[in-house]
Amino acid sequence: ITTGATSPKVTGDQLVLSFNDTSNLDADPVHKPANGAFTVLVNGVANAVTNVTVQAQAKTVTLTLTTAVTHGQSVTVAYTDPTTGNDTNAIQNAAGNDVASFAATAVVNNTPAATDTTPPVFSSAAVNGDQLVITYTEANTLDAAALAGSAGFTV
């Protein structure tokens, strides 16, 4: 498994592992580990793998997770070679050598933050001297640029 720029990454329910072996991974779709050979934890809670796909020439293994990861969650992945010796029940290179088991490894979470689709809601209006103060309820910060000048208000 690689580190740095090619370290494990997750976007939504797709977790991609990259390998740096000099040869390609085994391209035979039958020669892949069981879903249970991987342990994925999201914020410390198991997130089961539902599918394993090996991209031989890209030297990647993509895990499909039961539940999509959301922005900001902490993710780790571990792999246990399910059998001893070199066999087709493991991630292998083209020469038939098994990838060694690896302990929990941090995963880069590339899942984008959810977009805010809820508009601000009018709460109240009050006159304070020569100013009209309009209050909105909003989970985030109002966009000050959108409110520059009269911003479409008529008094």
Regions found by a protein language model. Give the residues of each.
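Non-catalytic beta-sheet/beta-sandwich ligand-binding modules that flank or precede catalytic cores
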Residues: I1-V155
